[in-house]
Each structure stands twice: as C-alpha cells, then as structure tokens.
C-alpha cells in the first residue's frame, strides 16, 4: 500500500448493487461524500447481471420495473452527490488505521483511507466465470478476454463463447460495421438458443442472415496453440476444439476469444477481515448495522440478524439507519432528523434548493 497514492475518503461503500447505491444516497443526505468499489465494470450488482430484464414488483412506489430500470433510477437519485466510482476492482485487504479509520487496497492497486466503511457486497464480489481448459490462462489479456474486458477485434477472427445478453451484445458489436469490426464472428453456445433483450435477438438474427455472424451449437473441449519459436512453450492461441451437439468434433481457428460465460459471486476477502460471520454473512447490530467495529457497517444480503429478509427494500432500510449511525459516529454527537420535504439543507444537498413544496 506504500507505493500507491492514498485516497482519502469520509466513506467507502464496497458493492455497487441497489443497496450500495442507496447507501450512497443516504450518506449524501447526511453530507458524507462516498467512494464506491465494485468488482464489476458497471454499477448494479445482481440487478444488472442477473435480473437486468426481469420484472421487480416489490419496490415501494414503483409498481413494476426491470433490474436495469431500477439501477438507472438509483443512478439518477445519487447523481447530485457525485460518488467516486472504482469499478472492475475488488477490495483485497481491509485493516484498521491508527486514527480509527480503515486502510484498504484493491486488486487494481488503489489504496484508500476511509473514516467509515459500508460493506454492501451482496452475496459476494461477482467475478467472471472462466473456461476450465488446461493452458488457456496463459493467453488471458492477449487473446483471451473475460466478460466485458476490452479486447482487440479489428480485422480479427473473433470467437464469442456464451449464450446470454453479454455474449449476444459482444458478438453484435464485433460484427457491426465500424473501425473495430472483426473479419469474422462466430458465436458458440451449447445450443442454438440465446437469452437477451428482444431487440438484441432481432439484430443477432439479422446479422446471421447476412452472414456476418455464424452460430455453432457446441462446447469447447480444448485449445490449439502454435509453439513459440525456439521454445517448447505455446506462443499463440490459434483455435479451439469443439464438440458439436451431434457428437462430432471440429477445430475452430481464431485470433481473439471472448468468454462471456456469466459471473458468479465469491465472498472472497470479506471472510478474512476478522468480522463475526454466521454462514458466510456478517453479524450486525440492527440499531446501527454496525459490524462490531466502530465505523464499519454491513447492509444488504451480506449481513445477518434475527428476522433478516433478503429483500432490496429491507436493504434500503438498513442503509438508511447505517447512514445515520455513521453521521453520528463522525460527528461524535446525535444527528437531528430532517425531512427532504421541508429541510433547506437537504434540498441544497440534493441540488433542488428553492424548489416549491407541493
């Protein structure tokens, strides 16, 4: 941590799912600026990854919305507070600082000193699922890329592996005319059926009909690599081996392999932070949602307490009480309850000062 520039923060929220985003909002109302760290390259957590196009019916005041729509609404709600986002990063270490705050570092090399920390990591950090093929890891970052990682595609033979919205979107992006258009695009999935938004499925079909995208119903069973000159080590990935649904095998040449196999949650370093855990969840005090250490809070699916219900709306309640507790912790004194309908200070923080009261 000594080699990285230390970022000072009043609050750091670990996790950018709906509860983490609402935590930012509640902290903003208390006048506390927040930094947000998430392993995904975008905000939204489970809602964005697993329920983007699925309807949600139990958000108060919103009869129905998709996961994507809920994330967009929360993004709009926190905009006045301009949180600093540290995406595609996972917190690796968390330790007490001499002044009573917290020091932690991410796997991307960022180092932060936070006066308060809010663990809103859901069921854990979402990390891309990988392909369990011997030797493929040596090509990661040069020819093999996971999930939404940027990848060179211009003029290349691109193979996209996966059957959900990210795979479909990446295949379309590679096949569309433009400066990064691939020479060829092959979308490989175990069956010729895909889960994506209707407009993306329609565009995929159009690109298939025009010959810009080829779809193969198969599974990858191995890789093919050319030897590096002068050594027995493979220097370049040249293709993958496929087992088709009819039992036949074939080789598929490629320059770039995009693995869009979804993501899976991992509790990861949270388990090593010395917190009181019960079934991989952080035990909290329901008055403050403190994780047992002054200034450290846990909200949402990552916490547990008697009567716990893993619902988004329950997480919103937890984030509200945690923000009040943090404000009192930082101030060293009780914090007055204010209402957004009448408080001039809250309206100023929201950027709506002078707005009339209905």
UniProtKB/Swiss-Prot annotation:
One Pfam family this sequence matches: Pyr_redox_2
Essential cofactor(s): FAD
Subunit structure: Homodimer.
Binding site for FAD: 38, 46, 51, 91, 126, 301, 341
Species name: Paracidovorax citrulli (strain AAC00-1) (Acidovorax citrulli)
Transmembrane segments: none
Reactions catalysed, as given in the entry: 2 reduced [2Fe-2S]-[ferredoxin] + NADP(+) + H(+) = 2 oxidized [2Fe-2S]-[ferredoxin] + NADPH
Enzyme class: oxidoreductase
Entry keyword NADP: yes
Protein name: Ferredoxin--NADP reductase
Entry EC no(s): 1.18.1.2
Family statement drawn from the similarity comment of this UniProt entry: Belongs to the ferredoxin--NADP reductase type 2 family.
Keywords of the record: FAD, Flavoprotein, NADP, Oxidoreductase
Keyword Flavoprotein (UniProt): yes
Cofactor note: Binds 1 FAD per subunit.
GO molecular function, one term: NADP binding
